[in-house]
């Protein structure tokens, strides 16, 4: 299914970014897990199957925006607190316009910022990921335009080094 393939791809790219950023081995493992599990809350919504072939309503979009919190709740009590936090905040934006908590800049957990850029690159550049696909080069252009607004500039620079 698309959600599984997407999660695997985000996990692999998160690992590559973590390694490029010279994170300690345990932090690389956390990045891999955060990438793999970032959309685990979607299972509670059945979003992948329900809305694939149509535009969701505003109510459905609001439900969708709860998946990071649902994902964090699924991981509570597992000892993966940093991964759970990364999952909760992977839709936060550098400028504070994201969700669920409208965090900005360095207030967004580091792994959330890493997973966010990996996820957007995958959604933009891989066929069958919920929207029309663009080339990897075009995806990088789009992400570069969001540097300092949607994305942490450090993560964008690491992404460019990893995928080019």
Locations of regions flagged by a protein language model:
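Histidine- and acidic-residue-rich, metal-dependent catalytic cores
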Residues: 1-164
């Amino acid at each position: 299914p698309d959600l599984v393939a997407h999660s695997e791809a985000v996990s692999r790219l998160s690992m590559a970014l973590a390694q490029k950023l010279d994170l300690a081995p345990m932090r690389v493992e956390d990045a891999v897990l955060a990438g793999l599990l970032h959309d685990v809350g979607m299972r509670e919504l059945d979003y992948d199957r329900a809305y694939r072939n149509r535009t969701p309503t505003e109510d459905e979009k609001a439900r969708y925006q709860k998946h990071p919190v649902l994902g964090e709740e699924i991981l509570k009590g597992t000892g993966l607190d940093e991964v759970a936090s990364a999952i909760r905040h992977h839709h936060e934006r550098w400028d504070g316009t994201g969700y669920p908590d409208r965090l900005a800049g360095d207030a967004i957990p580091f792994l959330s910022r890493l997973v966010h850029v990996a996820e957007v690159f995958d959604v933009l550049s891989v066929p069958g990921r919920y929207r029309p696909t663009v080339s990897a080069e075009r995806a990088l252009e789009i992400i570069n335009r969001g540097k300092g607004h949607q994305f942490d500039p450090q993560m964008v620079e690491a992404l460019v080094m990893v995928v080019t």
